[in-house]
Design a protein with these regions (language model features):
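Catalytic histidine-centered segment of alpha/beta-hydrolase-like enzymes
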Residues: 270-283
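Conserved HGGG/HGGXW glycine-rich cap/lid loop of the alpha/beta-hydrolase fold
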Residues: 22-74
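Short glycine-enriched nucleophile-adjacent loop
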Residues: 114-125, 130
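Conserved alpha/beta-hydrolase "acid-adjacent" motif
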Residues: 245-251
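Active-site loop/oxyanion-hole signature of alpha/beta-hydrolase fold enzymes
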Residues: 11-16, 21, 63-112, 122-123, ...
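Flexible "cap/lid" loop of the alpha/beta hydrolase fold
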Residues: 130-165
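Conserved alpha/beta-hydrolase catalytic His-Asp/Glu region
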Residues: 166-231
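Short beta-strand/loop motif that positions the catalytic acidic residue
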Residues: 232, 238-240, 244
Length: 296
């Protein structure tokens, strides 16, 4: 793996440093760009990356690029300080432009990343294929456990209302992070649950400042993939879960019908953490999708 910093242009010709991790064969014929979810960073998708790359005896002809979203992980906030969906779309388009991958380009988004990717592709991001994992198929407040989303809205509103020091501390409160983690994990494997909680403890609070989190959260609950689906002509793979508390499975089927060319694959026994709990079947669906014949 190669750890790299890219200088990406933003509003007013200002530039921002985006940290990304470059896996696999740099000369591969296919480049897969990953966009992680809200409050995470590139670590969240590493199990899927490992499954996709294979082992040394059977390496995949694949390059995988996993940036940290601006303001999260190792990436600096966006220039201008506005972390709206439109700003993240502009950033992704510029990041791909700077990356300048050769050959086939595939862009994958998980959770909030699915909204960013869908909006960017609908806005003209040039990519051959699209993959959305745990896509936000409908407004978050309408999900099976919309009450939890409303509690999250109150939590972030409270964090924004407090003095900066106390608001920042509330956002990083380990007990609240643990509650979020417990509510999302569906596995009954005690060891896997501990590992998931550890990942959230380590990476869920690595953000630049309070404003970044507040603005990104507002973007994540104000939009969903269904707004952009009809404008995405590229072959699209949707990987959904039957126990996702944020988007019910029925909404995923409706979402599929909005795309001109989408395939829906459902993984059972998992919720919004496919990337942690079911990386093997997710990677298998991705490999199958990437191997499909495409019209010339």
């Amino acid at each position: 793996v190669r750890e790299v910093t890219a200088s990406v242009s933003g509003t007013g010709r200002q530039r921002t440093d985006t940290r990304y991790w470059d896996y696999g064969n740099p000369n591969a014929t296919t480049t897969l760009v990953l966009v992680h979810g809200f409050r995470g960073d590139h670590h969240g998708l590493q199990l899927v990356v490992a499954e996709l790359l294979g082992d040394d005896a059977n390496p995949a002809d694949l390059r995988i690029v996993a940036p940290d979203l601006p303001g999260f992980g190792g990436s600096a906030p966006l220039p201008g300080g506005v972390h709206s969906l439109a700003a993240y779309v502009d950033w992704l388009q510029e990041f791909v432009h700077v990356l300048a991958p050769a050959g086939r380009l595939v862009v994958l988004g998980h959770s909030f990343g699915s909204i960013v990717v869908a909006a960017a592709v609908a806005d003209g991001l040039v990519t051959h294929d699209v993959i959305l994992v745990n896509p936000i198929a409908a407004p978050a407040l309408s999900g099976p456990r919309g009450v939890l989303t409303r509690l999250a809205v109150f939590y972030y509103w409270t964090a924004a209302s407090l003095p900066d020091r106390w608001g920042y501390a509330l956002l990083q409160n380990r007990a609240i992070v643990r509650i979020m983690s417990v509510s999302m994990a569906k596995t009954r494997d005690a060891g896997l649950r501990r590992w998931i909680h550890n990942q959230h403890d380590r990476y869920f609070s690595v953000f630049a400042n309070r404003r970044v989190v507040m603005e990104a959260f507002a973007a994540s609950i104000s939009h969903d993939v269904s707004e952009f689906a009809a404008h995405i002509r590229q072959p699209t793979l949707l990987i959904a879960a039957d126990k996702d508390d944020i988007t019910p499975l029925a909404a995923q089927h409706r979402l599929q019908s909005l795309f001109p060319n989408a395939t829906l694959r459902v993984i059972n026994g998992v919720g919004h953490l496919i990337h942690y709990e079911k990386p093997k079947p997710a990677a298998a669906f991705i490999r199958e999708f990437l191997a499909e014949d495409r019209p010339a």
